[in-house]
Amino acid sequence: MENRPAFNKTKIVATVGPASNTYERLGILMREGVDVFRLNFSHGSYEDHLSVINTVRRLNKDMRTSVGLLQDLQGPKIRLGEVEGGGVEIKGGDRIKLVCGEQEISTATRLCTIYLGLARDVKPGDQILIDDGKIELKVLATDRDKEVDVEVVYGGLVKPRKGINLPDSEVSAPSMTEKDIEDLKFGLEHDVDWVALSFARKADDIRFIKKIIADSGKKTRVVAKIETPDGLRNIDEIIAVADAIMVARGDLGVEVKMEEVPMAQKMIIAKCNAAGKPVIVATQMMESMITAPRPTRAETSDVANAVLDGADAVMLSAETAVGAYPAEVIRSMVGTILSVENNSPQLFHRWWPVNAAAPTFMADSVLSAACHLAKNTGAKAITGMTHHGYTAFQLAKYRPKANIFIFTDNRELLTVLSLVWGVRSFYYDRLISTDSTVADIRYVLTTTGHLETGDLFINTGSMPILDKGTANMVKVSVA
């Protein structure tokens, strides 16, 4: 892989849409600094998504890059159905009905949702929020079957197919809908690198999707999206079984009090950092750049604070999917990330205790030692050999200031690691001896400009190299 000699360690995930879905536009975004492209399965046809998948892979080949693909499943999003006249006005104090599972058109006195379980899930006094909280209803009564009597607390224009949030209720909808399962099969068939499960509420939700993946004979990694109170309550068990976490601040900011979201973000990031699991911060990071060529000061600060919190990646949604300035968004985000990383020593050298009881104790100790050694010697790089990726995830966990370069004989891993903090990957399969591998790594990193003559770098790997065992070796080398 041909890498940029200077690069941001915090990765960028960009959503693809009409503003960015051609070979030329995707190529521009990759050159500006996108690490992973998100395919939003709430929108678009399979034909649209397959075109993007094929185009990104063609660009990776043409540009000698390893940009990854993240499939984002829609999840059990509760929505209204169609609305009379394209929109009806409801006013505060109105008493109306919310009807479940009906295909009839909503009116100002009778709103209809396609979700069958709503009347069973709510109880008197519960909040019901529509359109990201713009409209608030209070439950007066429910027949526990099809109809809910509600009072309008904050009214407004009700538009078709807007989302419904139930922040006070235990939602009984399954973690994956039939649509999600079919969409997942499509993603697995086309070998996406990551799949994001929306509205993850408990560990069993992750186990369910992982079983589908395993039964398909795939090893696709799962991102759990935290966007409900249940997800927050069960965060520890979710982190334990997920491969990565997304702080999905859009629905989360509706489901819990908006003022609680910043601290929830910090809490989730801290737990993911300690567990060595990648964490993505998403939603409205540079929202104003949908229509403006520059971000607001608040948006720049939001991106900077996500980096300072320890996010592995920051994500863009409408900004790159439908916005007028997708390339400028990436350029601005890269600039902010680099500014923070170049001026924040507290970002680096995060030392976590090694668990002596863990089956990975030896490898963990070696990789921790490699990061300590890099800090103490001022090494410019840490290199690792891995087939499954464990070495890369562990090295990133310690947030070394030295650049992390991973060499692997597993081509699929190259794009998977595009999401992981600080990691840049190279394909390498000339496994002859440890000495020859170190010499090859030195050659690759010097010819690509990542090391200069005389630079120290730290090698980690397993000896003998042909056994492809766990990491058991640390070596200081000179370029």
What are these regions (language model features)?
Residues M1-A479:
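Non-catalytic helical/linker scaffolds that mediate oligomerization, partner binding
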